[in-house]
Every structure is written in structure tokens, then in C-alpha cells.
Amino acid sequence: MLINQFKNVFKKVRGMFISDGFKRLCRQFFWGFYSLLQAFLISCFILFNPLGLKNTSQEQSELVYLDVTASSFDARLDSAVVVLIDEYTIESHNLTYPVDYHSLARILRAINGYNPNSIFIDILQSYPHSNGFDYWANTLKRVGQNQPVFLAQDLDFDKSWRLNDPNNARHKLSQSAILTPVSWRGEPNRYPLTINHNGETYQTVAMSVYEEFCKTSDCQLFKSNEPHDEPMIVRWNNRYSDKQLDFLNVKDRCHSNQRSFIEAFGKHVVSTFQSKEELAELRVQCPPILTLSASEFLEESATDNQALRDVIKDRAVFIGYKLTGSSDLVTSPVHGQLDGVFFHAMAFVNLVSLDEDYWRSQNAIENCPIAKNCDFSRFDLYQALLQTIILGVSIYLKNHQLRDDSEVNAPSTGVFIIFVLFSVIVCAVVLNIQEATGPANWIALTSITLISVSMLIKPMLMRWTQQKLSKLSFGRSQNI
């Protein structure tokens, strides 16, 4: 009796587990897992970047995104001014390169007379190159009594024995100005706020100048205990200072260059089919920050000029060279190539404008559990996860329609619309996350989304075409 009851229960349990519904559920689980596995392997290939595809697409994504959002970047242009020692300055005042120390001191004294907030000199002075070096060092020291004077430094060159030798030029300059590093290892389109060198941490130019700026302003960046070791993604604006037309000979080129999102995006779409000359015309020709020629400060009226006073007072001044053939250049996605001093100035403007909300480039994951060195950040992992989900869903739907060996067995229009809406939500999530982390890899994400949509829309079009042909054939048969 008990044996028969046990057999009956066993048959019921077995029938329940091998029912058609359970089999269908197992098949769906298998195909879902198989689809996600395929998507996961593809995302891992992108994430681990064996061919450099991730870095290339990330870099291009940033260039496009920084350009199309340039109009919406509310940059505090009134916080900085750039002074360029250009060819006009050298030729009009019969100078030579490098400019002699007496002329540099004259420029510095004139700027100091207008009470700037701070001064940065983007000139690496490793050895004395003309007479008057001691006079220049003394001028730096006197001007530094009124406001901080930061001088460019190469940490690899400034060995301890140079800085400790009283007869060495670098020692004399270190006693007269604040040496600040201007070169670092790493990605050239990133601006670190701090540098670790030989076990010591140094602030870069933008961070040092901003710290001085915050002494008279309410800044949140220095109120936290964060190490600020995540480099900045420098944002660029496509507007120019209202007072730019009063200085430099740029009146023919400084016209309104504010582009809408669509216009900026269209520029990158057609850039592949245009020449370098045509691309140059699309770039913003005006400097991103109010820019003066150093010749203004070598004129006889340089010490009592109200126009100069209005644009120098309480601003951070960045001094640098602008010469043809210079290798100290930075590439702006909005302006093209600019002199290196603009990189420091624009990074400072980013800090003034965004404070602690500046766009960060997240560091690679430390103590990576899956590899010796993880060349990706947590934000990269988030992007890879979202890419896996989008691609996995599309592969699952594609596998679902092919199980019966028929491409006409396409997903319904409702399923397709839901998938598209899901993709839009994913993109919105990435857009929200990147407000604090910087531009996402939109090229990779968009490419995967388009591939996923194309896999689904092809069978839908085939089914729609077959239905139309069937109706047409049916209509003809009735007429016959």
C-alpha cells in the first residue's frame, strides 16, 4: 500500500518536473544564460582592451562630448588672464629668444602693479641664458611679497643636489618663487591636481593657483580630506571674453562661435570628409580665456593703463610663450592646438567654475582580483555591465527567433519598443553618472546599441515585407 502511494507521488512529482511548462522554462533559462554569456565575453573583450579599441573610442567620445557641451559650460572667464610672449612682442621690441631677464622683469613688474591674485610663469629656466639672472631672481622675490609667484618646474630635472647648491640657478629661483611642476607622466589629455614623485606629493599649477584663489573665496574642494588624486578632464568653452576685442589683433577672427548641440555634433560627423583647412574654419578661433600680448607691458604707458588694470586686478595671471614651431602645445576639442599655458589656465578656470564637482577621470582599480594590473576603473565596469545587458537582451531575442530556424519569427513591435525604451533609460543612467565622472564611452555604447537594434529590426522588416507580399498575393488570387 505504502509502496503504491510512493509510486503515485513519484509519478506526480516527475510529471511536474518534466511538464511542458517546466521544459519551456528550462529552455528560456538556458538561452538567457547563453545570450548573457556571449554578451559578457564581448564586453570583456572591450573592457580589457587588447587592441586599444577602448582607449581610442573613449578618447574620441570625450572629444565629441566636450565639443558639443562647450556652449553649456558656464566658465568663470573673469577669474584668469593669459599673457603671451609672442613673436610680435619679440620683433616690436627688438628682443631675442629666449627673452632676456631684464625684459622679463619689466613685464613682471608691470603686471604686479595692477594687483593680480597670483602669477604663474610657464617658462622652464634650467640655466642662466643672459646677463641679469640675479636681477631677475630678486624681482621674483620682491613681486612675491605682494602675491604668490609660481614658476614652472620639471621634477625630474630638479634633483636635490641642484636645489641645495647655493650657486645653482634652480636653487636661487626656488628661494625667489614657488616652484610648481608642469610635466607629468600619464595620459596627455588629463590634468592631475597632484603628482606623486619619489614618495612625495606635489600640487600642480592649477591646484596651487586655485588654493590661493580660495583664500578670498568660499571653496568646498579644500574642506574635504580627499587626496584629489583623480586627474581632471578639462572642459573647454566656445565663448570668449567681452574685453578680448580690446587686445590682440584678432578682430577679424573673434566672432561669435557659440554652436548648438546639433551644430557641434554635425561638425564631427562630417569631419572625416573634410580637409584640414575646412576643419580649421570650423574651430573656434578666439582664445578660450582673455589673452594679452606681453608687448602691452613693455610700452611706456604699461604702468598706468586703466584698461590693463581692469583685466588684471584680482585675476590669476598665466604667462607663457607663443612661438611658431613650439612643442609645448595642447589640443582643445573646440579650438584645436593651443599653447601649453592655456592648459594650466583652463584647468584653473574649471576649478573656479566647478569647484569639487570638476570632471574626474577615475583611477584604475587597485588590488585587481582578476589581473595583475587592471587598466580600467569602476566607471568602466558600470559601462561594461550596461553594455552586457543591452547586448545580452538583443542576443536573447535574436536566438529566440532562430530556434525554429525561421528569421520571420521576429519579436513583436511591442517588445522592440520596450527594448528601445530600455536602451534610452540605460543611456540616461550613464549620462547621470558621468556628471561626476566625466564623459562616458559613448561611441562604444552607441555602437553596441545600434548593432543590437539592427539584429532585431531586420527580422521585423522581413516579417512586415512577407505580410505585405502575402496580402498582395491574396488580392491577386481573389481577382482571378
Positions of predicted regions on the chain:
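Juxtamembrane interface at the cytosolic side of transmembrane helices
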Residues: I390-A436, M460-L472
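Selective detector of the "anchor" transmembrane alpha-helix that sits immediately C-terminal
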Residues: E366-R403, L445-M455
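Short hydrophobic alpha-helical membrane-anchoring segments
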Residues: F40-L51, Y396, H400, A428, ...
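Loop-to-transmembrane alpha-helix initiation sites
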Residues: E435-I448
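Flexible inter-domain connectors and hinge/loop segments
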Residues: L2-A384, M462-I480
